Curated annotation (Swiss-Prot):
Descriptive protein name: KH domain-containing RNA-binding protein qki.S
Nuclear localization signal, short sequence motif: residues: 324-330
Key words, A-Z: Cytoplasm, Developmental protein, Differentiation, mRNA processing, mRNA splicing, mRNA transport, Nucleus, RNA-binding, Translation regulation, Transport
Predominant cellular place of this UniProt entry's protein: nucleus
The species this protein was found in: Xenopus laevis (African clawed frog)
One family name in Pfam for this protein: STAR_dimer
Complex formation: Homodimer; does not require RNA to homodimerize.
UniProt record similarity statement: Belongs to the quaking family.
Length: 341
């Protein structure tokens, strides 16, 4: 009908969808020019991430979110009070189990999720609550660090009206007690979800059905099947640079003359036996272009001529520089040789 808004169904809380939301949040925070501009967009993105994580956590812990929605908090009656409760961790019964990591989660996400759902503040206190053992020993006995003398426990605090605070504290205690029950190896669904969240935060998450997170992101965004990429075309052999047959006349006809030359006494030329080749190999062709072809003999006019000679005369004296002349060589003339200077 006209005037009615079409309500779209929210995406299902899947790891791929959570990875897309985390990538969008990381992209927005990495752009300094857009930081703080799209306030509503950032708020909606944070709310969607919180909703997806909450639904995934509820599915993991086998708890019904519908029951939590029906049990809404009543209106506050009376003044604001502060309530707290300690839940001791069964470290002695399960000494090898990592309860601290199970309660806090990767980068504290599990504890933050519980705080957002229950409205209580959840903290791990006591011996072994700090990751740095040296720092824990240094702080032991100092003011505000008295809890280090107690056994490992979870401290739950809440501030609200009396009736609301009691309900919040009760829900938080129930949720934390579920985390204090160790699951069998390989059946801990919460641990699997925490490892998956850690992989998403580090950018190393890979879906079991897909090859890479980039492919998972593209398929989840477009909803299309993966396209098959064909292999490269076979490499063709390069074309011949020159034809095997000669393209012109012979450039060295002198070889044929030597092969058929005969001495005046009737004997064959001495070099004819050395030049005997197969009938098809009697001619030699140059494989190069014009600048590299055989050049004719150098003309005598290319050499320098003495100044005393006359060009074209019969008795022209040609000076050929077989050896390099020293540039500082002293020339001794006939008159200087007679005087000794």
């Amino acid at each position: 009908m006209v005037g009615e808004m079409e309500t779209k169904e929210k995406p299902k809380p899947t790891p791929d969808y959570l990875m897309q939301l985390m990538n969008d949040k990381k992209l927005m925070s990495s752009l300094p020019n857009f930081c703080g501009i799209f306030t509503h967009l950032e708020r909606l993105l944070d709310e969607e991430i919180s909703r997806v994580r909450k639904d995934m956590y509820n599915d993991t812990m086998n708890s019904s979110s519908n029951e939590k929605r029906t049990s809404e908090l009543p209106d506050g009656i009376g003044p604001i009070v502060q309530l707290q409760e300690k839940l001791y961790v069964p470290v002695k019964e399960y000494p090898d189990f990592n309860f601290v990591g199970r309660i806090l989660g990767p980068r504290g996400l599990t504890a933050k999720q519980l705080e957002a759902e229950t409205g209580c503040k959840i903290m791990v206190r006591g011996k072994g609550s700090m990751r740095d053992k040296k720092k824990e020993e240094q702080n032991r006995g100092k003011p505000n660090w008295e809890h280090l003398n107690e056994d490992l426990h979870v401290l739950i605090t809440v501030e609200d009206a009396q009736n609301r605070a009691e309900l919040k504290l009760k829900r938080a205690v129930e949720e934390v007690k579920k985390l204090l029950v160790p699951a069998a190896e390989g059946e801990d669904s919460l641990k699997k979800m925490q490892l998956m969240e850690l992989a998403i935060l580090n950018g190393t998450y890979r879906d079991a059905n897909l090859k890479s997170p980039a492919l998972a992101f593209s398929l989840a965004a477009t909803g299309q099947a993966p396209r098959i990429i064909t292999g490269p075309a076979p490499v063709l052999s390069p074309a011949a640079l020159r034809t095997p047959t000669p393209a012109g006349h012979t450039l060295m006809p002198l070889i044929r003359q030597i092969q058929t030359a005969v001495m005046p006494n009737g004997t064959p030329h001495p070099t004819a036996t050395l030049m005997q080749q197969a009938p098809e190999g009697g001619l030699i062709y140059t494989p190069y272009e014009y600048p590299y072809t055989l050049a004719p003999a150098t003309s005598i006019l290319e050499y320098p001529i003495e100044a005393s000679g006359v060009l074209g005369a019969v008795a022209t004296k040609v000076r050929r520089h077989d050896m390099r002349v020293h540039p500082y060589q002293r020339i001794v003339t006939a008159d200087r040789a007679a005087t000794g200077n």
